[in-house]
Amino acid sequence: MDVDLELLVRMITGYKYLNNNIPVASFENSMIELIHGDMIDADGLDYVCRDVWAGGYRNFTIDIDRLINSIEIVYNNTSGYSVAYNAKALNEIETVLNIKNFQYLYVIKHHKVLLEQYLLVEAMKFTACYHLDLPDDSADERDNALRSLCDYHAYITPKSLSQSKYILHRPTDDDFVALMKLYDTENMYIKQWFSRKYDATPLWKSKMEYFSVFKPVFQSLSEEEYKNIHTILMSPECKHFLCTQFNLQEKDIIVIEVKPKLRKLEERIFIKLNDNIKPYSELSHDMFSVVGTELPFCYMYINFNVLGVDDKIMHIKTIISRIKDFLLMELREKWDE
């Protein structure tokens, strides 16, 4: 069979030719992009359909046939060959973009998903200290222990863990679960991760709620000023303030930052409109019609079990009010400077 094996391998791996000025290389780069593109490709469309089905997104539908039938490889004197879409697929292109961004922000970065990931990492840090017979008194010691446990050499040669004598070789998820069980299932992080009964409760549960809650503080700030205040909210000083106000320990407060990495079309997708090739960004009225801006935000979780409160909702409002007071106090100090 007459097959261009080099092009086939490049299409699978996504390895494009560096010199796009050569017509043949430019055309083959467009072929590669169809299978292994940055924004929309064969695998990506398959994943989008799967995610819509598995995630139960009732607010998104895609006409895949319309999108595929609209694909062309076009040529212009400036950039050579490129993948373009017929204008009739504009709606499908925006839907694909919105699904990926929606999934990232509201599924991958959901407050429960992030908390579960945090607990797993913390559990594995203590587990690593135990199996490697290392101290676990400080955060740095625990971080270093986990890095040592997850060293890539374990994928090459067997590694005997000094404390438990467990042989770690080509580790999988099951190995790390076994290591946690061998350590201490009563460890606060391990216990929560296994049981899925989390002690910590989020003070807000979405990006929209976060900005709504702090609107009185944020509304008059520039983007740069907002980022400064966001840094203060993430700071140890803010956590210490809450510990003092509500008689908490630092371990009772978890703060997890979210830095949205939204997919932007910008100039990277081209639309064929009346025989003219236009960047999608020139035709799109709203590049973030579902998810909004890329400003960072955070989730803050409190262990209400140690507070012993009956009305959790009212107490959440009280804590948020104190956080606002702290932020405004910090703002005034900065303005006075």
Regions found by a protein language model. Give the residues of each.
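Histidine-centered, transition-metal-coordinating active-site segments
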Residues: 1-337
